[in-house]
């Protein structure tokens, strides 16, 4: 039986029961995002709602997960010239929105860019900062992040 790792209120739950039954309790949201390296080996991170995070967002109708991941990184960070190198992982986390329980399934991709343009946070999405982070900065930032984001880094 396949096991699924789901973050509920930032606590891990391993779902071994029927996955479809578990999912039926939630509104499912498909999303995609990127762990992006620049040519200097720095990693792109965003600061949203008081936490360090990676750029990601919801799939639009007719869009592939790869297209979504690139679009979301571009929109949330103002970066261009993105190339997908590989798929990294999938994460699952729940949240409550307007009294509805949501289960977000996020597809994560390893990306690179040669771009050195000025980064621009998408403030209307609650993003107050976007920056290229050294390995040490990433380590520090992950102390104020989400467990699912730490999982993405661990999948490298």
Label every PLM stretch briefly.
Residues 1-33:
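Acidic, metal-coordinating catalytic segment for phosphate/diphosphate chemistry
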């Amino acid at each position: 039986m396949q096991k699924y790792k789901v973050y509920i209120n930032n606590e891990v739950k391993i779902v071994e029961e029927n996955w479809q039954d578990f999912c039926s309790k939630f509104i499912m949201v498909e999303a995609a995002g990127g762990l992006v390296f620049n040519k200097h080996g720095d990693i792109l991170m965003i600061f949203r709602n008081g936490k360090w995070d990676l750029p990601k967002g919801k799939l639009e109708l007719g869009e592939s997960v790869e297209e979504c991941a690139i679009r979301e990184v571009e929109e949330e960070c103002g970066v261009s010239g993105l190339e997908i190198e590989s798929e990294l992982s999938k994460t699952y986390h729940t949240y409550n929105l307007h009294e509805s329980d949501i289960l977000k399934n996020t597809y994560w991709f390893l990306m690179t860019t040669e771009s050195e343009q000025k980064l621009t946070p998408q403030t209307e999405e609650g993003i107050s900062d976007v920056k290229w982070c050294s390995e040490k900065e990433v380590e520090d930032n992950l102390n104020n992040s989400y467990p699912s984001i730490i999982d993405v880094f661990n999948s490298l």
